[in-house]
């Protein structure tokens, strides 16, 4: 199942990379500088997509095998949001992505690198299934002894029959992006594994009038202010 999925979903970007690279190496006088830039950008985007896929594959393998040692420490949610937004891919520029925190001093106990990977996966997922120039919002607020973090988009939402299976490994919605790429169904499964390792839960709900809200919890850090 894994090998079948990998061979199917790596073929499209690899074919695109090799085809575009071949065109660039040919000395075609009709190939304008603008077209060369477009082909170079396409190669970069395909390579970046492959890199994300391999990162998710390696990460979820380590999580499933218990090979990840969590480096838990208190982190400011605002700092985590800022870091994630600063390292988003080129595709993110076509969307309006905002981040809001209910309390500037809101903190949670986490492995920052892993939680940032969760947020990047959720944001990339929202980018994948929403039209260009749509809005994606990150929001965090205290909820008892936890912090609830939400990634909300204004796309088509999640079919009712898919919500319970969405975080299963290799499950996809069956939708293919306009560029022919289709995920392996690892990103959300990895998110669930990481959140569960932190003692939290993750789920998804549809929002009115349309869109989806992916929510997960982390243990809240108690902040004591001294006069």
Where do the language-model regions lie?
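Short alpha-helical segment of the dimerization/phosphotransfer core of two-component systems
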Residues: 45-50
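Conserved micro-motifs of the catalytic ATP-binding
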Residues: 65-70, 107-110
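Short alpha-helical Gxxx[C/S/T] motif in the catalytic ATP-binding
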Residues: 187, 191
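Short conserved segment of the HATPase_c
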Residues: 146, 158-172
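Conserved catalytic submotifs in the C-terminal HATPase_c
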Residues: 71-76, 96-106, 143
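Short helix-loop "hinge" at the ATP-lid/N-box region of the Bergerat-fold HATPase_c
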Residues: 126-127
């Amino acid at each position: 199942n894994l090998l079948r999925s990998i061979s199917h979903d790596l073929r499209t970007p690899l074919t695109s990379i090799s085809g575009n690279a071949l065109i660039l190496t040919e000395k075609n006088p009709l190939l304008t500088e603008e077209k060369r830039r477009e082909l170079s950008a396409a190669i970069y985007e395909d390579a970046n997509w492959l890199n994300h896929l391999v990162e998710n594959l390696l990460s979820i393998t380590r999580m499933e095998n218990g090979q990840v040692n969590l480096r838990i420490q208190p982190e400011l949610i605002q700092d985590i949001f800022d870091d994630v937004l600063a390292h988003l891919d080129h595709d993110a520029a076509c969307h309006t992505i905002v981040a809001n925190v209910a309390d500037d001093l809101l903190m949670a106990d986490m492995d920052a690198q892993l939680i940032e990977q969760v947020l990047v996966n959720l944001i990339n997922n929202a980018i994948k299934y929403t039209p260009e120039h749509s809005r994606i919002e990150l929001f965090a607020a205290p909820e008892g002894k936890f912090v609830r973090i939400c990634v909300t988009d204004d796309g088509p939402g999640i079919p009712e029959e898919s919500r319970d299976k969405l975080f299963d490994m290799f499950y996809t919605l069956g939708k293919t992006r306009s560029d022919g790429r289709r995920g392996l169904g690892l990103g959300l499964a990895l998110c669930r594994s990481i959140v569960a390792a932190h003692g939290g839960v993750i789920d998804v709900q549809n929002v009115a009038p349309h869109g989806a809200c992916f929510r997960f919890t982390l243990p809240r850090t108690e902040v004591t202010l001294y006069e």
